[in-house]
């Protein structure tokens, strides 16, 4: 060995290069199903009854400028939606529409895929709410309902919730899916998993009770992952602090269950998380060049979320980090992290991480986030592709969302402007369609009229409990 080292130093022998192991793949549940099996429209891919979904009939968006999210140039086209799917994209002038279709003229407007936000906290408590009121489940749910409206009126048709109060994001997901409340699709992570003294365990106590799962030791980290899986998680969210064994256990368990892992961490914890095989790193927190190189080599993705820190810098004049993290940074440093990741070829998604009452600023924060992408070298169309197709891929939903191509779910945004030229035009929301349902018209949430259900007869008298006579 000593001779080999001496020879290598002399340039005579090349020592083998130690490389990280290949990224451990996420288990694909679809491989065990027949190709005709219909599955749930989320990363869980649960088999569901093969019945038509979405509203009856068909919808035609006629004469608009189509930005389809694939990276192709914007063109004039007509979009055909049948029930909850895009079935055709017709060239300008074509009129072969389905019989009885509802036709909406969108001439001069831009048709594009609904936007996706990869980093939300739907029920994070408001300023001024104390620990008792802020942690009340009913209040948390109502906050979530309100914020879903802010999102969908901003053209966002899918949100990934990466840390909220217990069951709240799961119930919100159910009610949106059933069209009982207006909003975007919800992809919840469940509780944030961290170690004692980690992110959310120290600080000002602003995290909701039930939003954090403290785990100690590798076996407990595995158990915490399984707990979120049982709740119905679409992704697993972890945060520093963690040991090498703990993060490896979490990733191993999540990938076995078919779920990706995203990590909120900083400095050397990023190196540790990437080496363990996490799928994504959140935020622009400090990291070394070697960590960025390792992310690129392992295919680790990133959701930079620059906009919340911009808000903090603008409102408070600076950021000092939480007591559990011990670092400082600036707008320039954050932007440089984004620039370095882009230059390294890391796949980047778009998320806002809006907390407290910042949701009320929408859609401006989302547009600001996209502007940071442009600032580091993306073209405007490339930034919009990141917000649609790339975000869908990072959700593990690239086969169903993110582009307006035949076979994809009909999540559509219609804008009064040219957002592929000027990002500020994203604020001019005209119509939003989610799962084939029109949920925003003329820029406002549209709630269909309640259609009374015919009560069966005879039925019980509400006061006496006796059956009423037939009329």
Give residue spans per PLM region.
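Metal-associated gating/positioning segment near the N- to mid-region
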Residues: 109-175, 196-199, 203-206, 273-276
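His/Asp/Glu-enriched, well-ordered alpha-helical/loop segment
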Residues: 135, 332-418
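C-terminal cap of metal-dependent C-N hydrolases
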Residues: 406-450
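Active-site core of metal-dependent hydrolases
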Residues: 238-333, 354-358, 377-379, 393-395, ...
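Histidine/acidic-residue-rich catalytic or RNA/ligand-binding cores of hydrolases
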Residues: 126-129, 169, 271-277, 308-321, ...
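N-terminal pre-domain segments of enzymes
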Residues: 22-56, 457-471
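Divalent metal-dependent hydrolysis catalytic cores, especially in the metallo-beta-lactamase
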Residues: 144-169, 184-191, 231-241, 260, ...
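Histidine-rich, glycine-flanked metal-binding segment
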Residues: 43-57, 66, 70-112
């Amino acid at each position: 060995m000593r001779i080999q080292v001496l020879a290598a130093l002399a340039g005579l022998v090349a020592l083998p290069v130690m490389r990280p192991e290949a990224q451990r793949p996420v288990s694909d549940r679809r491989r065990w199903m027949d190709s005709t099996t219909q599955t749930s429209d989320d990363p869980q891919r649960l088999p569901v009854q093969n019945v038509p979904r979405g509203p009856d009939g068909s919808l035609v968006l006629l004469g608009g400028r189509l930005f389809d999210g694939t990276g192709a140039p914007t063109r004039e086209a007509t979009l055909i939606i049948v029930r909850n799917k895009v079935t055709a994209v017709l060239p300008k002038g074509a009129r072969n529409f389905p019989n009885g279709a509802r036709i909406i003229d969108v001439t001069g407007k831009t048709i594009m895929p609904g936007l996706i936000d990869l980093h939300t906290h739907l029920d994070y408590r408001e300023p001024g709410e104390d620990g008792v009121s802020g942690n009340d489940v009913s209040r948390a749910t109502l906050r979530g309902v309100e914020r879903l409206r802010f999102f969908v009126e901003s053209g966002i048709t899918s949100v990934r919730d990466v840390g909220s109060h217990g069951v709240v994001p799961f119930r919100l997901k159910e009610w949106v899916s059933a069209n009982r409340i207006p909003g975007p699709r919800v992809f919840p992570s469940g509780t944030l998993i961290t170690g004692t003294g980690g992110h959310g365990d120290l600080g000002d106590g602003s995290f909701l009770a039930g939003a954090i799962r403290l785990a100690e030791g590798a076996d407990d980290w595995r158990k915490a992952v399984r707990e979120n899986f049982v709740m119905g998680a679409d992704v697993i969210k972890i945060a520093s602090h963690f040991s090498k064994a703990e993060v490896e256990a979490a990733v191993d368990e999540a990938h076995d269950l078919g779920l990706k892992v995203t990590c909120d961490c900083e400095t050397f914890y990023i190196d540790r998380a990437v080496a363990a095989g996490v799928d994504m790193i959140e935020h622009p927190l400090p990291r070394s060049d070697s960590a960025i190189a390792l992310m690129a080599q392992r295919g680790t993705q990133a959701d930079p979320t620059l906009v919340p820190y911009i808000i903090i810098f603008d409102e408070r004049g600076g950021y000092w980090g939480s007591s559990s993290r011990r670092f400082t940074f600036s707008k320039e440093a954050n932007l440089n992290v984004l620039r370095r990741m882009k230059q390294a070829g890391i796949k980047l998604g778009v998320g806002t991480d809006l907390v407290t009452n910042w949701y009320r600023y929408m859609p401006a924060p989302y547009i600001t986030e996209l502007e940071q992408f442009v600032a580091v070298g993306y073209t405007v169309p490339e930034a919009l592709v990141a917000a649609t197709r790339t975000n869908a891929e990072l959700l593990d939903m690239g086969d169903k969302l993110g582009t307006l191509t035949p076979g994809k779910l009909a999540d559509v945004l219609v804008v009064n402007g040219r957002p592929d030229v000027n990002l500020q035009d994203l604020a001019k929301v005209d119509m939003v369609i989610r799962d084939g349902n029109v949920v925003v018209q003329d820029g406002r949430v549209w709630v269909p009229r309640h259609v009374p259900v015919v009560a069966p007869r005879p039925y019980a008298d509400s006061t006496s409990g006796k059956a009423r006579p037939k009329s």
